[in-house]
């Protein structure tokens, strides 16, 4: 029998969340962001479920797009960081991948690299995030260059990215949206600005195409709301099992550093999961897991391969019982808050030794 630490991916939850997105953005095309192994949920598990139900898959790089194509998935892919060298352009066009152009060097590569077929492109403009994107005043020259290049598909898109969408009260959001909407250069035939947070908070930003990421996987993009608040269902269940149970005397120190002890006899369960699997090491006291239909608190430090839970008040729990680390019952947003981070990071840091099921 293999180690019980695993990810359970729920296709029905994925489809429910996609339905919620389409309800919030009626009539809009959907680019499903599946970069970083579908936010840790597994591109092998996610892409076939979404194939044919969306406009395109959004990935960070060529390698991620090729991995999707190798699955036999036919939905188009868009490289959101574009190409990292001119050599990648021919591979992209041969596989019908669209490329985001965000820098003059990428535009130069494109203009100087004749291609056998017209390549689909999106132009990224910087409206205030100051990370990637052309300046607004550069867009006309970019468009002129693309229009005169015979190996560029003329269905050119324009996109930007909001820096503070997860904080809807920030004035920068409306400033960026307004700047984007004021761009009147002809030739851009489709536009996109809305990520998960903007889809929910700024309907006026939805434009032609929306780009859901974290909400697709049933996780809230906001610090003060969870998946249930937004009508989303977690796609990932991070699971393990009780591998050992020990009855300890009063004041027995548990785990590295002896950071936890009880003034009465305690019953400690060992769960086969730790920071080597992607569970955060630094969590606050009484962070829960879900066992036998109830929450049980983690005690002591999280180790590389295991963590310990207090079963003193739960005598019915046995070795082999299933444990949910996060998922349907214990939302990942809660664990992220306990660890002082965000759900995105926890999903993406699941290690390779955790198997998908």
Curated annotation (Swiss-Prot):
Query: Catalysed reaction(s)?
Result: L-alanine = D-alanine
GO cellular component terms, alphabetically, are: cytosol
> Per the UniProt record, which EC number(s) apply here?
5.1.1.1
**Is Isomerase found in the keyword set?**
yes
Q: Which residues bind substrate?
A: 131, 304
Q: Which GO terms describe its biological process?
A: D-alanine biosynthetic process
- Which HAMAP family does the protein's record reference? Ala_racemase
Q: What is this protein called?
A: Alanine racemase
């Amino acid at each position: 029998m293999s180690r019980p630490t695993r990810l359970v991916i729920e296709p029905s939850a994925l489809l429910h969340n996609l339905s919620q997105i389409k309800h919030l953005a009626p009539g809009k095309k959907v680019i499903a962001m599946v970069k970083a192994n579908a936010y840790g949920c597994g591109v092998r598990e996610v892409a076939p479920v979404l194939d044919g139900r969306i406009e395109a898959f959004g990935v960070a790089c060529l390698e991620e797009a090729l991995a999707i194509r190798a699955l036999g998935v036919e939905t188009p892919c868009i490289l959101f960081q574009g190409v990292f060298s001119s050599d990648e352009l021919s591979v992209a066009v041969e596989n019908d991948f669209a490329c985001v152009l965000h820098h003059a060097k990428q535009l130069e590569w494109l203009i100087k690299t004749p291609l056998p077929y017209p390549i689909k492109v999106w132009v990224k403009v910087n409206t205030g995030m100051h990370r990637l994107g052309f300046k607004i005043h550069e867009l006309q020259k970019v468009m002129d260059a693309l229009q005169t290049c015979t190996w560029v598909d003329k269905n050119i898109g324009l996109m930007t990215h909001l820096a503070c969408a997860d904080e809807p009260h920030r004035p920068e959001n409306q400033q960026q949206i307004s700047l984007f909407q004021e761009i009147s250069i002809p030739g851009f035939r489709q536009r996109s600005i809305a990520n998960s947070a903007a889809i929910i908070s700024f309907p006026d930003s939805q434009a032609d195409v929306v780009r859901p990421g974290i909400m697709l996987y049933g996780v809230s993009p906001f610090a003060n709301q969870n998946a249930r608040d937004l009508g989303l269902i977690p796609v990932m269940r991070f699971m393990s099992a009780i591998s050992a149970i020990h009855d300890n005397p009063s004041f027995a120190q548990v785990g590295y550093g002896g950071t936890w002890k009880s003034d009465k006899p305690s019953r400690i369960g060992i769960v086969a999961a730790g920071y080597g699997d992607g569970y955060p090491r630094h969590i606050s006291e009484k962070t829960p897991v879900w066992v036998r239909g109830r929450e049980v608190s983690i005690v002591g430090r999280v180790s590389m391969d295991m963590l310990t839970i207090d079963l003193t008040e739960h005598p019915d729990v046995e070795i082999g019982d299933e444990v949910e680390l996060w998922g349907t019952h214990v939302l990942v947003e809660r664990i992220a808050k306990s660890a002082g981070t965000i759900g995105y990071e926890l999903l993406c840091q699941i290690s390779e030794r955790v198997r998908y099921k």
